[in-house]
C-alpha cells in the first residue's frame, strides 16, 4: 500500500525534495531514495513470503534466519512510522490513492481476477486433500463405538478446516465479480462525451527543459505549445518585480559564490542592481542539482544557453507573453516586514502590468489582496479564485478557480463545472493524472512536464462502457472456466489416490486372512548325530510345541538309566576324511504380513568312509 501510494504521488516529488532542501540545505532526490527503498523492501518481503509458501507446499519445516527476522522487524517498524507520518501530516495523500483508483480500478479489477485464479490452485489442492482425508478416515473407521466417536470428531475437524479456507476465497471472488457495479471512472464514457484536451500552463516555464523562472524556460514552454505561463513574483527593495520561487537565493543562483553570507536572506531585501548580476542557470546543468530525476539530457547548445541565464523581471515575461499572445498567471508574494512595499505591493505590480501594454484579458489575476482596487484600475483582468463555495465566487464575480489536483476527488468538481466555472488544476506532471483531468472535462492544467503532456492526443486508460462490460464478462467467464478446471483436476487426482488406497487396503485384508490358515509342517526332520535325541534316545519326545521351534520336555523325576545306544565308530582301513557338515536351509515365508516365518530345516550328514558304520535316522513327528 505504501509503495503504491508513493508511486502515485510522483507529481509531488519536487515539492518533497524542496522541503527537505529547506530543512537540510542540501539538494538530494530523497523522493527517489524512498521509492527505491520501498521497492527493495517490497521485493524482499514478497520473495521471502513466496519462499515460505513453496516450503510449506513441499511440507518442509520453516526456519527463519536471525538476519531475516531482524530485517522483517525493520520493515514492519518502517511501515508503521511512515503510515503514522502520512496519517498525521499528509492526510491529503490518501486523496491521491482515491484518484488513482478512479482511473486504475477497471484494470485492478481484471488483474485481481487473474491473481485469484492463480491462487485458486493451492486452495483447490488443499480442499481436495482434506476431502480425501475425510473419505479415507471414514473407510478405515472401526466398529468400536469409542473409536468410532473419536474418528467422527476428527472428521468433523477436517470438515471444519475446509470452511475457513474455501469460504473466504469464494466471498472475495464473488466481490471481485460484482466489483464493476461500484466502480466510477471518468475515463469510462462514450467517445462523443469526451471533452476537449485541457490547455496547458507552463509551471515556471518549462523547468524540465530550462532553469525555472528564466527566459529560457518560458521560451521552451512557448515552443512546446503552452497556452499560458505560470510564475512567482517577488519585489526587490527598490520596487522592481522579478521572478523567483524560493524565499532565498541559495538554490537557483550563484550567490554562494558571490556573497555567501547573504545566501539565506530574503531576496526582497536586495536591490535590483545586485540581483541582475546573479547567474540563474549554472546550477541547472550540474547533475547533482537537477530539479527532476526524469529530466532528459540537455544538448550542448542548451547547456551553454542555460549557463548564461539571469533573473528576469516581470516586464521581461510580459513582453514575451504579449508577443506570443500567451496567458499569464502568477503567485504574488507579499514582501516581508520592514519592506517599503509591504502594504502597496499589489498596486506596484498592477502599474508594471499596465505599463507593459499587454492585453488585459491575458492576465489571470490570482492574488486576493486588494482585489477591488485591481478591478477598478484594470477591469479587463480575468480574476481567479481559490476553491471556495460557488456562492462566494458568484458574489465576487469570479468565474475561474485554481485548485490542487487532489481536489478532483471524489466527484471531479462536478458542481463547479455545472455552474460553468473555468477550472485550472496544479501541478499535473503524470500522463495518468492528465488523462484523468481530461476525462473529467477540466479546462486547463499547470505542469512541469510540458514536453510530455503536450504530445498526448488521446487520454490514457480511456474505454467505452460497452467495451468495459465486454471485458468484465469475458474475464469473469474465463476465470470461472479456469477455476472449475483446476478444481476438477485436483478433485480427480485425489479421487484416484483414494481408489488406489482402497484397492491396496482390500488386497492387504485378503492377504491378512491367510494368517489363520495352518501351515503343514514337514513330515520328516533328519537329526544330526550331535542332537540330544540322537545321543540320548531315552529322553521323552513329547513337549509343548511353539510355532517354528522344537522344545523338548524336561524329563520326569524318575529317570531310567541311560544306556549308550550309539555304536562307537571304528576307523576303517583307509584314511578317514573329517566330516564336513553342510547345513542347508530352505526358508519359505508365509504370504501374509503378520505370519511368522516357517522354515523347513533339513540337515544332511556327509558320508564317512568307515567300516560299515551305521547311524539310523531319527524321525521326529509333529504331534
From Swiss-Prot:
Transmembrane helix as UniProt keyword: yes
GO terms, molecular function: glycerophosphodiester phosphodiesterase activity; metal ion binding
Domain GP-PDE: 198-457
Keyword Glycoprotein: yes
Domain of life: Eukaryota
Any GO BP: lipid metabolic process
Subcellular localization: Membrane
Entries under PROSITE patterns matching the protein: GP_PDE
Topology feature Extracellular, residues: 39, 91-109, 184-468
Enzyme Commission code: 3.1.-.-
Cytoplasmic side: 1-17, 61-69, 131-162, 490-623
Transmembrane annotation, as ranges: 18-38, 40-60, 70-90, 110-130, 163-183, 469-489
Glycosylation sites: 308, 397
UniProt membrane topology term: Multi-pass membrane protein
Protein name: Glycerophosphodiester phosphodiesterase domain-containing protein 4
Organism: Homo sapiens
Amino acid at each position: 500500500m505504501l509503495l503504491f501510494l508513493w508511486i502515485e504521488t510522483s507529481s509531488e516529488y519536487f515539492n518533497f525534495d524542496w522541503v527537505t532542501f529547506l530543512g537540510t540545505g542540501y539538494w538530494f532526490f530523497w523522493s527517489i531514495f524512498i521509492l527505491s527503498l520501498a521497492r527493495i523492501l517490497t521485493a524482499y518481503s514478497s520473495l521471502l513470503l513466496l519462499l515460505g509458501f513453496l516450503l510449506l507446499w513441499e511440507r518442509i519445516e520453516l526456519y527463519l534466519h536471525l538476519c531475516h527476522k531482524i530485517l522483517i522487524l525493520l520493515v514492519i517498524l518502517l511501515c508503521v512510522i511512515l503510515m503514522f507520518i502520512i496519517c498525521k501530516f499528509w492526510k491529503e495523500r490518501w486523496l491521491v490513492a482515491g484518484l488513482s483508483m478512479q482511473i486504475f480500478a477497471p484494470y485492478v479489477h481484471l488483474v485481481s481476477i487473474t491473481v485469484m485464479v492463480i491462487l485458486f490452485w493451492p486452495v483447490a489442492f488443499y480442499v481436495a486433500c482434506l476431502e480425501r482425508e475425510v473419505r479415507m478416515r471414514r473407510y478405515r473407521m472401526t466398529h468400536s463405538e469409542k473409536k468410532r466417536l473419536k474418528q467422527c470428531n476428527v472428521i468433523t475437524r477436517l470438515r471444519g478446516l475446509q470452511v475457513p479456507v474455501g469460504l473466504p476465497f469464494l466471498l472475495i471472488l464473488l466481490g471481485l465479480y460484482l466489483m464493476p457495479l461500484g466502480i466510477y471512472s471518468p475515463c469510462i464514457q462514450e467517445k462523443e462525451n469526451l471533452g476537449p484536451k485541457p490547455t496547458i500552463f507552463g509551471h515556471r516555464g518549462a523547468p524540465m527543459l530550462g532553469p525555472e523562472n528564466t527566459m529560457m524556460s518560458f521560451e521552451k514552454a512557448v515552443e512546446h505549445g503552452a497556452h499560458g505561463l505560470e510564475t512567482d513574483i517577488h519585489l526587490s527593495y527598490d520596487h522592481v518585480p522579478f521572478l523567483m520561487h524560493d524565499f532565498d537565493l541559495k538554490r537557483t543562483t550563484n550567490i554562494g559564490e558571490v556573497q555567501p553570507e547573504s545566501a539565506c536572506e530574503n531576496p526582497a531585501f536586495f536591490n535590483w542592481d545586485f540581483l541582475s548580476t546573479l547567474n540563474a542557470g549554472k546550477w541547472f546543468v550540474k547533475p547533482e542539482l537537477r530539479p527532476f530525476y526524469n529530466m532528459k539530457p540537455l544538448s550542448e547548445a542548451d547547456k551553454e544557453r542555460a549557463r548564461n541565464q539571469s533573473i528576469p523581471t516581470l516586464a521581461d515575461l510580459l513582453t514575451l507573453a504579449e508577443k506570443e499572445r500567451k496567458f499569464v498567471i502568477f503567485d504574488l508574494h507579499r514582501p516581508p516586514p520592514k519592506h517599503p512595499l509591504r502594504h502597496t505591493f499589489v498596486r506596484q505590480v498592477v502599474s508594471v502590468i499596465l505599463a507593459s501594454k499587454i492585453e488585459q484579458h491575458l492576465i489571470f489575476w490570482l492574488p486576493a489582496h486588494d482585489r477591488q482596487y485591481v478591478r477598478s484600475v484594470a477591469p479587463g483582468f480575468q480574476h481567479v479564485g481559490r476553491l471556495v463555495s460557488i456562492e462566494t465566487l458568484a458574489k465576487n464575480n469570479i468565474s475561474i478557480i485554481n485548485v490542487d489536483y487532489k481536489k478532483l476527488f471524489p466527484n471531479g468538481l462536478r458542481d463547479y463545472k455545472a455552474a460553468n466555472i473555468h477550472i485550472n488544476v496544479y501541478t499535473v506532471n503524470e500522463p495518468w493524472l492528465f488523462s484523468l483531468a481530461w476525462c473529467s472535462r477540466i479546462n486547463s492544467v499547470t505542469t512541469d512536464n510540458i514536453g510530455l503532456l503536450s504530445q498526448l492526443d488521446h487520454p490514457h486508460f480511456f474505454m467505452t462502457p460497452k467495451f468495459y462490460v465486454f471485458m468484465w464478462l469475458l474475464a469473469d467467464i474465463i476465470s470461472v472456466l479456469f477455476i472449475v478446471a483446476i478444481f476438477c483436476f485436483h478433485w480427480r487426482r485425489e479421487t484416484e489416490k483414494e481408489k488406489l488406497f482402497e484397492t491396496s487396503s482390500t488386497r492387504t485384508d485378503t492377504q491378512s486372512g491367510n494368517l489363520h490358515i495352518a501351515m503343514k509342517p514337514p513330515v520328516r526332520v533328519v537329526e544330526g548325530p550331535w542332537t540330544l535325541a540322537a545321543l540320548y534316545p531315552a529322553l521323552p519326545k513329547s513337549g509343548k510345541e511353539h510355532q517354528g521351534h522344537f522344545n523338548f520336555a524336561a524329563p520326569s523325576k524318575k529317570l531310567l538309566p541311560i544306556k549308550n545306544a550309539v555304536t562307537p565308530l571304528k576307523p576303517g582301513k583307509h584314511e578317514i576324511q573329517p566330516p564336513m557338515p553342510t547345513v542347508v536351509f530352505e526358508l519359505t515365508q508365509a504370504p501374509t504380513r503378520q505370519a511368522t516365518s516357517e522354515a523347513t530345516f533339513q540337515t544332511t550328514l556327509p558320508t564317512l568312509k568307515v567300516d560299515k558304520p551305521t547311524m539310523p535316522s531319527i524321525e521326529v513327528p509333529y504331534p
